[in-house]
Amino acid sequence: MCPRHRHSCRQVLASLLLLAAFSGGPPLSGAGSTSADATTPFLRDALQGFDRWDADHDGTLVLREIDLAIASPEVTAGQAAAAVALRRVAGNRRKPVTSFTRESIRALATVARVDDSPAWQEDSGSARSATLETCYADALEKITSTPRDLFIDGQPRLAGCRQGRLGSCFSLAPLTALVNRDPQAVVRLFRAEEDGSITVLLGGGATPVTIAPLTDGELALTSSTGGNGVWIALYEKAVGQFRAAGKAGATPSTPLATVTRGGSAGTMISVLTGNAIRRFSCAPWREPLADSATQAARLGELRSLLRSGTADRRLMTAGTSATTRKVPGLARKHAYAVLGYDAATDLVTVRDPHGQTFEPAGETGLENGYAVREGIFRVPVPEIVQFMSGFAFQRETPASPAKHADPSVATDAGASGDE
C-alpha cells in the first residue's frame, strides 16, 4: 500500500474512534456510516474553509490554525461560525478534540457534545447539550444580528453584560466594576482612529493598545452587552493583544487565544487603572487548624477594606480557585466584580461576569447558593470568605511598571489569583 493510502486509512480510523468516543458505542465497521449530510450548513462551511485554514497543508487542523482563522478578517459569516464551532469543541472540559481532519469533522458534526456551559447552568439544570451544528447556528446568529457600534446608548450598561466563550473573567471583573462605578470612565477608555482601528487606553491612559476591528469569528466568541455595543468585546481583544505583546520570545498567539488562558483579576485592576492594588487572602478559612481569633481579626480587616473601598469608589474584585468551596450557582476558578459593601447589613454585593439569574433550591446560603439576578448577588461577610480565595482592592497610589506589565500570573484559566 502506498504511503498516501496508509495516511488516508489512518485518518478514517481516527475519525471512527472519535465517533465511538462521543457516541458511547463501539467503533463502526465502515467509513461510509460516519458521514453526516454534507449539505448541512456547518459541514458545508467547515469543509469549504478547511484548506484555507490548514496553514501547513498537512490535512489536519490544529488549535492554532483554528485560532488564526477566527482572527482573520477574511474568514466571514458561515465560515467564521464554523471555525468558532470547531474552537468550542476543541475547548471541551471532558472530551477536548485537539485536531481535526475532513473525515473527523464529518464524523463529529452531529454527535460531538460541547460541554462549555457555565457552572451556574449545570447547577440549575439549564445547561444545553450543544453539537457542532448548534454551535455553528449560535455563532452565525450572533454574527448576523449584532450591531458593530462601539456604544449604542452613548455609554455602557451593566445590565446585559454577559461573558462569552472565553476564559476572560479576570479581565471582565474589573471592567464591570468600573461600569458600575463610572460608565463614562469606560467610554473614555476607547478612541476610534481614522483608519478604522480602535485604541483602548489601559493603565489609566498611559498604555494605549491599538487593535483592528472585531472579525466575525471574534465577535462570535467574545462577551456581549445585550445590544449596548461591542465595547466589551473590543476590551477583551485589547487585553489579549496587550498580554501577547508582553511575552517576549513566546510563540505568537492571537489576542483571543491569549486572553482565554486566564489571569489575575487583581492584577487587571492595575492594568486597567494604572494604580497599585491591595490583596486580601481567604486562606485562614481553608486551613483546618486556623483559630477563631485569627479569623475574627481577619474579618475585621476585610470589613475595613470593603468599607473604605466602597466609600472611596475604588475598584474591587474577588475570585474562587479550583480548591475553594463549591457553592451552587457559582463557579470555581472564576473572577467576580465586587460592587459594594453595606456595613449595616454586613452584606457584600458581587457580580458574576456571566450575568446569570439563579434561584437557590432552598434557603439562601452556602449549601443552596444565593439568589442571583443578572449576575448580582449579596453575601454576608462571614460566608463569602468561605468560598472566595481572595479579594483585590484598588489603591490610590500608582502601580510600578513591573506590577501591571503582565496580568498573567500562575493561575488556572479564568481564575482570579487574588490571594
Where do the model's predicted regions map?
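Bacterial N-terminal signal peptides that target proteins for export
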Residues: C2-L13
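Compositionally biased, intrinsically disordered/low-complexity regions enriched for serine, proline
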Residues: P3, S23-G24, P252, S281
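Structured alpha-helical subdomains that flank or immediately precede key functional sites
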Residues: T34-H57, V62-E419
